[in-house]
């Protein structure tokens, strides 16, 4: 199935010159959303995944149905101040400054095989930070899955050494 036909490209959003990839027009078609999810599920099965980790918010949209299909748990990565219990955190760079991502300190057991999911691989900063959180807790990043990769931003370079699945490339 050609998933790109279900992604709406919105010009000049959120700012001029950006070609925003809107996945809601993929997700609102049940059979298409299921197909995309199933591709990631098959990838995960090949890697003997114990847990799915996804950064807010679209990492939840991708990761939760995969976790459900596999019968494994899902651990959210959130911005600082959004998780109620003790967390580990990592600071990461943004285009104009820094931000902090967190995960519950007890979300991952040492040795658990983790699949990190997100909607989009752009510069790789968010996923690089997510990897650091998983590994700090003793998890093994067994794979990383995205719906979309923006190849011209070279985000894959930050993830060198990790196994990556992308369903669409622009």
Curated annotation (Swiss-Prot):
Reactions accelerated catalytically: AMP + diphosphate = 5-phospho-alpha-D-ribose 1-diphosphate + adenine
GO MF entry, a single one: adenine binding
InterPro entries: Ade_phspho_trans, PRibTrfase_dom, PRTase-like, UPRTase/APRTase
Claim: Glycosyltransferase is one of the keywords in the record: yes
Family named by the database record: Belongs to the purine/pyrimidine phosphoribosyltransferase family.
Quaternary structure note: Homodimer.
Protein name: Adenine phosphoribosyltransferase
Name of the coding gene: apt
């Amino acid at each position: 199935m050609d998933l790109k036909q279900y992604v709406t490209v919105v010009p000049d959003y959120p700012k001029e010159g950006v070609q925003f990839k809107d996945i809601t027009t993929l997700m609102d078609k049940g059979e298409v959303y299921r197909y995309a999810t199933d591709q990631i599920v098959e990838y995960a099965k090949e890697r003997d995944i114990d847990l799915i980790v996804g950064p807010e918010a679209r990492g939840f949209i991708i990761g939760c149905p995969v976790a459900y299909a596999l019968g494994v748990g899902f651990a959210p990565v959130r911005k600082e101040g959004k998780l109620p219990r003790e967390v580990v955190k990592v600071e990461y760079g943004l285009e104009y400054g820094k931000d902090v991502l967190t995960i519950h300190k007890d979300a991952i057991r040492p040795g658990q095989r983790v699949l990190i999911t997100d909607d989009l691989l752009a510069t790789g900063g968010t996923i690089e930070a997510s990897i650091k959180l998983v590994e700090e807790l003793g998890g093994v990043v067994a794979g990383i899955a995205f719906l979309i990769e923006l190849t011209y931003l070279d985000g894959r370079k930050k993830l060198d050494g990790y196994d990556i699945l992308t369903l669409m490339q622009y």
